[in-house]
Amino acid sequence: MPLISILMAAYRAEATILAAIESVRGQQHRNWELIIASDCGADYLALCGANGIDDPRLRMVSTPAIASGPSAARNCAVAMARGDFLSILDADDRWQPEKLSALLPLARSSGLACDNTRAIHPDGQAIATAYPVGTTPGEIDALTMMNTGVPHFPLLRRDLAGAGYRAELRFAEDVIFNMELIARAGAMTLLPQPLTDYIQRPDSATNAPGSWQRAEAAYGQILPMLESGRLAIPSRQQTAIKRAFADKRRLNLAYGAAVEAGTAGTFQEFLATQRLQAD
C-alpha cells in the first residue's frame, strides 16, 4: 500500500485545522503522512495534542519566515515528504473518507488524478461543484481545469511535482501548479465524485477583504510569465490558456466591482450566479 504524503499549508488556522486533520485521519486509505507547514509560527502539533490527537503520522515544518505564503509553505512540506504520492489539503477544507482510496488507483495508472471539488458554506450547504453532476469520468486538460473556476486538489505521483510551487506567486499558485502538473503528466484523470469540501468562509484567502486585489496582482504576474514562455504548458494550448487567464482576470475585476458595491458574497457564490446568468 503506497505511502501518500499530504501537504497542508497553515497560516493562522487554529479555528479550522483540527477538522481538516480529522478528515485525513478518517481516510479509508491508512498509509499516509500529513505534513503541516506552519507559516505563522504556530505549533500545530501542540494544538493537536491539547485536543487529544496523538498520531505519529502527523509531522510539522515551519517556513523560514512568517507569512512566506502558501507556495513556500507547501514547498517546505514537499521537501519533507517521504511518500510515493503527494496530495494537497488546505487547513480550512475537508475530505470525504474515500478521497485517497478512490483516487489512488487512478493516480497509479496515469500519475495524476482529481475528484470533483465541491464548494460549500461552513454549514454544509452546497454552492457548486467543479463539474456538473453526471459528468463522465475521463481525462481533462489544463484548459478544462481552468475554466471551471473551482480549485482542484489532485493526487499525484511524486516525480511529477518538479520544482514544486512557484514561490513568487501568493494567489492562483495552485492553478499554475496544477497546470504544470498536467503538462508533465499529459492529462489529469477526473473522478467526477465530490470528495473534497472546499469551504467558503468570509475570512478565507479568496474571500477576505482585499482578495480580489491580490488576485489582480497575481494575474499581473502570471500573464507576463505566460507571454515569456516561463510556464510549462502544452504549446498547442498556449493561445487558449492565455485567453482563459485574461477572461479570469476580467471576471475577477467584475467580482471586485461587486464587492465594492456591496452586492457580492463569496467568490464561489459570485461565480455560481454568473454561470446561472450565462445559462
Identify the role of each PLM range:
Residues I21-P64:
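Acidic donor-binding segment of Leloir-type glycosyltransferases
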